[in-house]
Design a protein with these regions (language model features):
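Feature detects long, helix-prone N-terminal segments enriched in hydrophobes
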Residues: 2-178
Length: 178
C-alpha cells in the first residue's frame, strides 16, 4: 500500500473518542498481604473463561446455566476467571513486589450490562481488583468503579447495573481489607 492510499483508508473511517472520569478506589488494610489475598479468594468462585464457555454449551438453556453460575459465584457474586501474580512476574526482572491482580466477573451480571448497553460495554468486562503491598509494606486493595465508565452512555438501565457492580466491588474490597 502506498502512503497516500493508507492515508485515504484512515480518513474514510469514523472515530469517536469519549472522555470519562475514572474513580479509582484504594482501601488500606492492616492485614498482611497474604491474608488479604486469601480472604478475597475465599469470597469468590473460581472458573476459567473456557470452563464458563463449556458450562454454557452444556446447559440445555440459559436458566440452567444461570443456576450453575449462582452456585459458582461465591459469596461475593463474583467469579475469579484469571489471576495475574505481578510479584512472580516481576521477580524475573528482578523487581521485588507483592501484587496480585484478580480478573473477576459474573456472566449473569455481564448479561444485564450487555443487554442495557450493547456490545460496546463488553470492553469493560470482566472487571479487575488488585491486592498489593505498597512501598511502606502496607497492604492495599484497589479497583476502578464501573459507574463512572458507564455514565457517558446516559442510560439509566446501564447506570443501575453499574451501581450494583460497584456495590459488589466495594463489598469484596472491604472483605479483603478488613
Amino acid at each position: 500500500m502506498r502512503p497516500l492510499q493508507a492515508l485515504t483508508y484512515f480518513i474514510s473511517r469514523t472515530m469517536t473518542i469519549t472522555d470519562f472520569t475514572n474513580k479509582h478506589v484504594v482501601l488500606s488494610s492492616d492485614k498482611p498481604f497474604a491474608q488479604a489475598v486469601k480472604d478475597i479468594q475465599a469470597e469468590m468462585g473460581r472458573a476459567s473463561t473456557e470452563t464458563l464457555g463449556e458450562k454454557l454449551s452444556a446447559s440445555k438453556d440459559f436458566g440452567e446455566f444461570a443456576e450453575e453460575m449462582e452456585f459458582l459465584a461465591g459469596r461475593s457474586n463474583f467469579i475469579n476467571v484469571a489471576l495475574l501474580n505481578w510479584g512472580k512476574v516481576m521477580a524475573k526482572v528482578p523487581i521485588g513486589m507483592k501484587a496480585v491482580l484478580f480478573v473477576i466477573g459474573n456472566p449473569l451480571t455481564a448479561r444485564k450490562l450487555l443487554e442495557a448497553g450493547g456490545p460496546e460495554v463488553g470492553l469493560y468486562l470482566p472487571t479487575k481488583i488488585s491486592v498489593y503491598e505498597d512501598k511502606e509494606g502496607k497492604t492495599q486493595v484497589a479497583y476502578d468503579q464501573m459507574g463512572p465508565v458507564m455514565a457517558p452512555y446516559n442510560n439509566p438501565q446501564l447506570d443501575a447495573v453499574a451501581a450494583a457492580i460497584d456495590k459488589a466491588l466495594a463489598n469484596l474490597a472491604d472483605k479483603a481489607a478488613n
